Amino acid sequence: MIVDSSFNLAVHALICLSHSGRSLSSEALAENICTNPTRVRRVLAGLKKAGMVETREGLDGGYRLTADPATLSLRQVAEAVNTRFVDCAWHSGDIDRDCSICSGMAGVMDALYRSMNEECTAYLSHITILSLIHISEPTRP
């Protein structure tokens, strides 16, 4: 199973934008996230469509957080970037076989993965971007 990194990138970008309090370019975000600006733009397009960020062109342009980090849940972020936490591209068995186990296993596993994704997104409903900002800030002496 492979989990798409879009959710991780989106959360990281939202924390950066919230912490900075100003617009940041895709290049500045990419530098902090340790990825490339094209990937940042691709993922943040989903956040923009969901109304979490806005973009502005020009000298002071870039991405700016428009959502309230105190109420923006990780579930909302996951939904904005179409995250599936549990997925499997390969299925065992063969739907065309006479064996009920062999022909039914893909459906059984898909239902299991669907339930696991529902549990993950329900859990994320209770975690906000602001709560992660407090966790991500290191304690300094």
Describe each PLM feature range.
Residues 79-132:
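Amphipathic alpha-helical dimerization/coiled-coil segments
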Residues 51-66:
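Beta-hairpin "wing" of winged helix-turn-helix
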Residues 44-48:
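Basic amphipathic alpha-helical segments that dock to polyanions
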Residues 2-35:
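N-terminal helix-turn-helix DNA-binding core of bacterial DNA-binding proteins
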Residues 38:
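Key DNA-contact positions within bacterial/archaeal DNA-binding proteins
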Residues 133-139:
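Conserved small/polar residues in nucleotide/adenosyl-binding loops
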